């Protein structure tokens, strides 16, 4: 079952620098939520707090709560590795493991989780590649390097790798920014398909993409460079793009700044 995410009073730091302040929002299950806003507004930081990926940077910490179906992501005894199994992530640039085959890329997380049976691995590889709309393109060359695929195929391979461990949430940090328009369309079509099984949160600088793929949109901004980013407005995407409540939101989506 896809997961609901409740964020309350979230403030994120990198050392002494306050990157984002007092974020409150609820992300509904099996929806696509887009995070938009100018560079430096904290949208990617908020995304990374949803599976504790920000903690890979020294001095990173958070205040507030992130609840996954009521369970505190930052509660005592919560294992970040277990969190990342539940909340998968796809990064800005396709990052297949360069020395691994397509098959090995997909099963990498499964093997880390202790799955060893060949029949189960084979089944999960096909399921995941089909889920990522990639199976028909690679089924006859699973033993070849994943890095030999095109950029768009590599990104879909990374999505297959992420969904192979059966997460409930998929985070996508500008997943199309390094791709050509045709590959971007393929990823957008895939996102529309995946939301029937996963809660999806996507960071994007592309306003048209946000309006096309998302059900809800969160607009983040900041007063000036060096200030913490803040959530300005969060609503259904149709509302944000047709009748935003905040002037800053309207100015941003209409291209007046950012």
Swiss-Prot record:
It is an enzyme of class 7 (translocase). Part of the ABC transporter complex PstSACB involved in phosphate import. Responsible for energy coupling to the transport system. The complex is composed of two ATP-binding proteins (PstB), two transmembrane proteins (PstC and PstA) and a solute-binding protein (PstS). Its main location: membrane. One of its GO terms (cellular component) is plasma membrane. It catalyses: phosphate(out) + ATP + H2O = ADP + 2 phosphate(in) + H(+). It is found in: Cell membrane. GO terms for molecular function: ATP binding; ATP hydrolysis activity; ATPase-coupled phosphate ion transmembrane transporter activity. The gene is pstB. The keyword Cell inner membrane does not apply. GO terms for biological process: phosphate ion transmembrane transport. Residues 5-247 form the ABC transporter domain. SUPFAM superfamilies: P-loop containing nucleoside triphosphate hydrolases (SSF52540). It is a peripheral membrane protein. This is Phosphate import ATP-binding protein PstB. Belongs to the ABC transporter superfamily. Phosphate importer (TC 3.A.1.7) family. Keywords: ATP-binding, Cell membrane, Membrane, Nucleotide-binding, Phosphate transport, Translocase, Transport.
């Amino acid at each position: 079952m896809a997961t609901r995410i409740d964020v309350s009073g979230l403030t994120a730091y990198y050392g002494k620098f306050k990157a984002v302040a007092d974020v409150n929002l609820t992300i509904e299950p099996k929806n696509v939520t887009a995070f938009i806003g100018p560079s430096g507004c904290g949208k990617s930081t908020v995304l990374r707090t949803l599976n504790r990926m920000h903690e890979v940077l020294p001095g990173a910490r958070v205040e507030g709560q992130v609840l996954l179906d009521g369970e505190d992501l930052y509660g005592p005894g919560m294992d970040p590795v277990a969190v990342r199994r539940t909340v998968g992530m796809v990064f800005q640039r396709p990052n297949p493991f360069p020395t691994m085959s397509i098959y090995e890329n997909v099963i990498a997380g499964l093997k880390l989780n202790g799955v060893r049976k060949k029949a189960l691995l084979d089944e999960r590889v096909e399921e995941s590649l089909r889920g990522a709309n990639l199976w028909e393109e690679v089924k006859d060359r699973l033993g070849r390097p994943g890095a030999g695929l095109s950029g768009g195929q590599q990104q879909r391979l990374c999505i297959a790798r992420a969904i192979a461990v059966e997460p409930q949430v998929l985070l996508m940090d500008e997943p199309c920014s390094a791709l050509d328009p045709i590959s971007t369309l393929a990823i957008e079509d895939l996102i529309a398909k995946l939301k029937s099984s996963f809660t999806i949160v996507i960071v994007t600088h592309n306003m048209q993409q946000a309006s096309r793929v998302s059900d809800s949109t969160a607009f983040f901004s900041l007063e000036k460079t060096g200030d913490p980013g803040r959530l300005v407005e969060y609503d259904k995407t149709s509302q944000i793009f047709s009748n935003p409540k905040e002037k800053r939101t309207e100015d941003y989506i209409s291209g007046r700044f950012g």
